[in-house]
């Protein structure tokens, strides 16, 4: 059987520009079961900090900054980058077909089809039994009705995902991971035994449960073992997850920011225990794992649990888990990377400002060894999808400025295809060529910059409103494209939130911290969020807040016409 490397894909993450919302880039919470001193977090992702970066819910800033996981340009970047690292597919953390995770799944499938990539499901089955689903199914108040919908969602995945060429399957069996916390044993048995309508050639789905590996610390040493339960008997096997953290963080000064932690050596022992567990449970597939780090402070443990930690150790933790898997090379069918992009728990391998492409380089090197393939390519190859992404954005900006860009888009599609097929030299040449071409095209664009100040009378604040008197600026803003930012100070005197709206579109949401100080912030106001621009741009304020010192900076751009 062909060995596979898959990566967990976390979400949702959105942007005001693309989606009119932020998803999990914004987060406020308290780690309810934590005993550490600092267990509260507040990330206002609409705000641009003094260093020019958005205040994102992460402790490791993405290399490409805040992007939308519904943006096809961004998904193309992610998939092409993953393919260069010998990753075969993403397993989307999914809830049900009406849940917003399904939007990401459908968009991901479209791009995956173009790029020859697989998509699987890590089913967050607990989401299915929250009240969320009742918003879409008013009669789903009983557990029985929710179970009926669960069966419908299995059939939905078969029909929509797994019968396509991108659906992750092994020997004709769709792969579904169950994260746990939703179904009980009896309910799952009924789900698994149901006769689903399968297309010709497809076999029944394989369901894998998260491995119940438990640890115990004695005399500064940790031992792991399988905690046998009924799940290991009724599913088709288990899959590895983040190594269990059992050391007492509060007992040490170094790890006092967390309740629990694990070391690099613990992670290695976890892998050994996982392989033993897969043998004991007679898993139909052996699905091991690698994990670079764990730090759930950015999400305050999802406002529920305690805080735990595994140090990245400058990439050594991730590499050591890969080495352990190489020792068991003949005993595994799949390596599951946890994760591609979970920034809130800081176990992403997607490139960041802090770590660059280091974890992807590690993945490329060890995944090829584990698969028995030649490790082709160079570290510089990873830059190609990023360069393509920025060219995509440049072309979209030229289009907003008034240029016909169909020809350029076709050229970029060709570059994506070359990267997909590892025609690196050709992709490099075409990238250099179109970069030079677009530099010349940009010379046709005229930029104008404007600054409106409250103290000059161009901005007025009234109760519940900020009024920007655009006057002659309106013509420039409607003639082509523009970028704009609003700066202001607010009195941080409560723990409540306030919001800015333009008509029916939310521009920002700020959660205050009751510091009793004036805070100065800067937020972008995207052209996509301003509908029906008039000479007076009225921003409605929702919530009680004092505002002062408002300024509005605009950079307009359009095609130069003689």
For each feature predicted by the language model, list its residue ranges.
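Intrinsic-disorder/low-complexity, polar/charged segments enriched in Ser/Thr/Lys/Arg/Asp/Glu/Gln
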Residues: 465, 483-487, 518-522
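Glycan-recognition and processing domains
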Residues: 446-480, 553-562
């Amino acid at each position: 059987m062909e060995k596979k490397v898959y990566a967990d894909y976390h979400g949702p993450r959105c942007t005001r520009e693309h989606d009119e919302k932020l998803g999990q880039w914004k987060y406020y919470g308290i780690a309810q079961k934590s005993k550490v001193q600092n267990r509260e977090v507040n990330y206002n992702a609409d705000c641009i900090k003094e260093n020019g970066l958005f205040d994102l819910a992460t402790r490791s800033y993405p290399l490409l900054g805040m992007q939308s996981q519904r943006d096809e340009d961004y998904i193309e970047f992610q998939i092409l980058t993953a393919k260069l690292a010998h990753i075969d597919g993403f397993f989307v953390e999914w809830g049900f077909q009406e849940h917003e995770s399904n939007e990401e799944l459908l968009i991901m499938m479209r791009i995956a089809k173009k790029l020859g990539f697989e998509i699987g499901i890590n089913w967050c089955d607990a989401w299915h039994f929250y009240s969320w689903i009742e918003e879409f199914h008013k009669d789903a108040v009983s557990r029985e009705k929710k179970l009926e919908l669960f069966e419908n969602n299995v059939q939905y995945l078969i029909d929509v995902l797994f019968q396509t060429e991108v659906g992750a399957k092994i020997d004709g069996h769709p792969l579904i991971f169950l994260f746990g916390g939703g179904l009980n044993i009896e309910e799952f048995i009924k789900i698994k035994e149901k006769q689903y309508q399968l297309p010709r050639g497809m076999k029944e789905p394989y369901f894998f449960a998260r491995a119940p590996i438990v640890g115990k610390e004695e005399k500064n040493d940790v031992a792991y073992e399988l905690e046998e339960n009924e799940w290991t008997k009724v599913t088709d096997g288990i899959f590895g997850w983040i190594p269990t953290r059992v050391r007492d963080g509060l007992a040490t000064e170094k790890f006092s920011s967390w309740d629990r932690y694990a070391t690099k050596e613990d992670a290695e022992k976890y892998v050994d225990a996982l392989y033993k567990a897969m043998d004991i449970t007679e898993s139909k597939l052996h699905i091991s794992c690698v994990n670079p780090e764990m730090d759930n402070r950015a999400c305050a443990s999802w406002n529920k649990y305690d805080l735990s930690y595994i140090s990245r150790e400058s990439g050594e933790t991730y590499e050591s888990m890969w080495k352990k898997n190489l020792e068991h090379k003949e005993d595994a069918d799949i390596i599951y990377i946890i994760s591609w992009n979970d920034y809130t728990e800081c176990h992403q391998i997607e490139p960041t400002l802090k770590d660059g492409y280091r974890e992807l380089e590690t993945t490329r090197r060890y995944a090829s060894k584990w698969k028995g393939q030649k490790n082709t390519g160079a570290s510089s190859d990873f830059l190609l999808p990023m360069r393509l992404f920025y060219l995509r954005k440049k072309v979209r900006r030229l289009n907003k400025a008034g240029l016909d860009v169909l020809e350029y888009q076709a050229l970029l599609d060709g570059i994506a295809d070359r990267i997909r097929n590892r025609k690196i030299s050709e992709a490099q040449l075409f990238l250099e060529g179109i970069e030079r071409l677009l530099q010349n095209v940009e010379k046709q664009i005229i930029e104008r910059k404007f600054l409106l100040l409250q103290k000059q009378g161009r901005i007025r604040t009234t109760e519940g409103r900020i009024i920007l008197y655009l006057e002659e600026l309106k013509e420039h803003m409607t003639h082509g494209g523009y970028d704009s930012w609003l700066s202001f100070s607010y009195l941080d005197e409560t723990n409540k939130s306030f919001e800015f709206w333009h008509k029916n579109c939310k521009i920002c949401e700020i959660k205050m911290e009751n510091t009793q100080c004036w805070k100065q912030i800067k937020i972008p106001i995207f052209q996509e969020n301003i509908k029906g621009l008039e000479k007076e741009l009225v921003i409605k304020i929702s919530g009680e807040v004092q505002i002062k010192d408002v300024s509005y900076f605009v950079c307009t751009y359009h095609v130069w016409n003689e």
